[in-house]
Amino acid sequence: MPIDKKLKVKNSTVGWIGAGRMGYAMAERLAKGGCDIAVWNRTKAKADPLAKYGAKVVNQLEELSTKDILFVMVSTYDDVKEVLGKALAKGKPKMVVECSSISLEGSAELRKMLQGKGVEYLAAPVSGNAKVIKAGKLTFVVSGPKSAYETAKPYLDIMGTGSSYVGEGELARIAKICHNVMLGVVIQNLCEVTILAQKAGMPRHAFLDFLNKSVMGSMFTRYKAPALVNLDFHVTFTPKLLRKDLDLGLDAGRRFEVPMPLASATRDLIQSMIGRGWTEQDFATLLLQQAQASGIELEPENVDVKDGLS
């Protein structure tokens, strides 16, 4: 999806921490949208290509300390603490927008620390991956001060199709945890029914074509159909990252006394993948595990299947 020219913003300076698969694609859209953006990544070479879109790639985190809005998109809570600690060592931004998948407790600790420094804080985790971002279909769920959200919203709109404000505090973290628990349960079930259909004699592409045209079809099932049909498991989200999010969900379930038997079973299946050494593949390789458990071998069907993004 092309960037809406009406969304271009230049009123605020933007700092960006993290240029992994997700962070790079998000920062790229901001740069292409005309934002005054400076980017830091632990491995600078991964961020350097952003310069051709107008971003300034910096060597030190401290160079981002006085930006109006500082976005963070890294892997873990420990990473968030480390990079923010260095970024705020010699100054402070007006606002931090934290987009990583972290726990409620970690997010609350960050909020307390930043509020103590007079910095506004938004929890703004996302739904999507790098390909979804490039298609302009990333979505955010956001919690924190409503006034801060209104300031950040134009930048969120540049990166995707929009954002949902769910209230104060860490409510966005709960929403993202619930989202990713559902992601794990749905991909496992999608693999189960796809293998069931195949073992009964149906081509995977035929079954998924029907499913995606039915009321059960969704952006996610359509997006994953090419991988399940043609066994093209380029990495969008690893089993280890999904295990982390399922663990966060199960921890939240214990905290709020909510039984989560499906999430627990799915977590065990993800752990089984990791135990096999399938740690860096895409999480959709659950299909291969399901096929092995069902006594069948899979071959690519080599059928042109659309992913629903274009």
Predicted regions and their residues:
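Rossmann-fold NAD(P) dinucleotide-binding segment
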Residues: 61-117
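Hydrophobic beta-strand scaffold residues
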Residues: 37, 57, 121-122, 163, ...
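Helical "substrate-binding/catalytic lid" subdomain
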Residues: 171-294
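NAD(P)+-binding Rossmann beta1-loop-alpha1 motif at the extreme N-terminus of oxidoreductases
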Residues: 2-72, 94, 298
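Rossmann-fold dinucleotide-binding core
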Residues: 101-184
